[in-house]
UniProtKB/Swiss-Prot annotation:
Residues 145-279, 297-359, 380-404 are annotated as: Disordered. GO terms for biological process: exocytosis; intracellular protein transport. This is Synaptotagmin-like protein 5. May act as Rab effector protein and play a role in vesicle trafficking. Binds phospholipids. InterPro entries: C2_dom, C2_domain_sf, FYVE_2, Rab_BD, SLP-4/5_C2A, SYTL1-5_C2B, SYTL5_FYVE, Znf_FYVE_PHD.
Amino acid sequence: MSKNSEFINLSFLLDHEKEMILGVLKRDEYLKKVEDKRIRKLKNELLEAKRRSGKTHQEASRVCVHCHKTLGLIFDRGDPCQACSLRVCSECRVTGLDGSWKCTVCAKVAQLRIISGEWFLEEKAKRFKQVNVLGTDVVRQSILRRSPGSEETQNQEQAQQCVDKSDTLSSVRQKTTHDGPKKKGFLLSKFRSATRGEIRTPKPESGRSYSLDLDSQNLQSFKSASGSDRGSTTSSDLIDQEAGRRTSKSSYSNGGIPVTQRSPVPSAHSVTSINSREHGFENSMALATIENTCEELTKSHRRNTSGTPSIAVSGTSLSSERSRSEVDLSESFAEDLEDTSSIRSRSVPGALDKDLNSLEDTEDGVDLVSSRFSANTHSLASGLSTNSQAGSDRKRSYLNVPDADSDTTSLNSMMSVYSETGDYGNVKVTGEILLHISYCYKTGGLYIFVKSCRNLATGDEKKQRTDAYVKSYLLPDKSRNNKRKTKIRTGTNPEFNETLKYTISHTQLETRTLQLSVWHYDRFGRNSFLGEVEIAFDSWNFENPCDEWFVLQPKVELAPDISLQYKGELTIVLRYIPPEENLIFPAGQRQEKKIFKRGKKKESSSISGGILEVFIKKAKNLTAVKSGGTSDSFVKGYLLPDDNKATKHKTAVVKKSVNPEWNHTFIFSGLYPQDIKNACLELTIWDKEAFSSNVFLGGVRLNSGSGMSYGKTVDWMDSHGEEQRLWQKMADNPGTSVEGVLMLRSSMAKCRL
């Protein structure tokens, strides 16, 4: 379908008929949004079911892949699904009308394909080439499109109106002496309201409505038409031509009034110049010029507002649809002020500790520099944003949205260290936050005006001081590009008066949730959590924005089924070599294995205990952090509870890929069979950043999932699903390599089952 054939000639329709059709199209668009929400809900349920079961490779295990029920050897053995070939129990089956059955996940996939109409779109794509053009869009564009003859008719009508004005110009000269000041005052007020967009262009007499995409050449064609229709050189014609020439300029010599798109009001110099005119011929010509300018500015304003291009989703929205990145936290400033438990937890989201150890790796040094820099630069650490006073005259559009270039714009906070690491302090959450949320459909701008907070908790009990700031995310995206922050305000009733801005289409905004959290900033320690608010935009009313108080809520750790988010997959191969098999290796090979156990003294020529080999094979569908849709990723590994920095293993950095292949082996020695039940293999994937903190892309933990390690309760023994099965399979088959594909966690915080 060519571009010209995408329009239908609907010029025969009257205005009320077009309005009725547009009303039907609007209802159709609303129903489509409702249907999209229903399909998204079904897709989320399907994703949750897949995540619950995981991608398992069952060779000898007798476990149902979905409900994890242990299968019997004779009775209730389970059968492989006819679609996915995974073994499931009798309760995880869905029988069809023809008697065949599928597992619950495959049945949901088939049901989603039918309900969403995907099968119809596939059949349509086979028969028709242009499947991306909807009939409703064609009708809507055809109605809003101006017919070819309407432009000429409009020019003729405007030219006739201009001729009528020239006929009455002589009478205007006579009345100037008596009511000139009143006329000028009225026109000036009319000009001010026109520049603000308050004057509405009247409908033409033909009964046809102007389209929303008028050309910018309309004004020029009007002036050329008005000049060509008049052949005589009377005084009134000369006056109209002179007025037309002055109107077409960007600034007027008689009034000094600049004609620009973004001018809200005329300057003081312009008003003074106009009011200081003397009566007579020049005065009447100025009045006619201003009157024409009012109408033309009104039309130009309507063209500019309606001719705004379609909303372009920012790079933040596109790249962050599936991203929830977290920052690799390394040494921070003045770590010796607080007690710590491990260095490992400082580099893993889920725990923030502050130890001061020797810098061994390059990225650790960079993280230390960035942390100190952010701590010393108060303005940068608290976010790059500008204030707007509460009583200031703020420029707003027709939806009560501040202009994008006003003094309420907020920028990304790129120099701060993330607080979303699972350690929120022990401050009791109290207080409320006052917000004004609005959305501009023309520019796709979401504006969160943070006014103030009241009755906040005290952030520092020793100093009885609260240095509060507000941080926001559009969930599920928690990447650095999606974070906004206000400046730091002192007191338990701080006044912020700052606007946090996001650029996102309204369709995507309906799938997002705004998370606003209040934090106490500690220059030499960790920030304390003071409360948060989560606002879902799926049913939010943007038509009537108003100020609203929201009660701050404490941080709630969600269950894994709710907080899980797809971050990609990691393929690894595990092999445990027990001590008895390790002893048969030659002495030279034993010494070579000894080298891989970093941080231990090489006093003994033999290795005590067994060896754990972890082959880091590859990853798929990692989060794209770089601007080109890629990441520079590497894997970091610990064998807990041994979390010393000297025992950390790292792969090389694979640049510019979201599907990296490392083919690197980690070797941990000194492991006995009883240690396997109490140890935990923690693997995290990071994006390498040259001059800032590394970005967390996902991770896994492999252990028995008992929650206990050597008789102590620990939060990192929390494996479940495929992580737990792969670790148990390795322990049950010593000396044998076992391969598994693991779903990456979006956060390394404790998973509560």
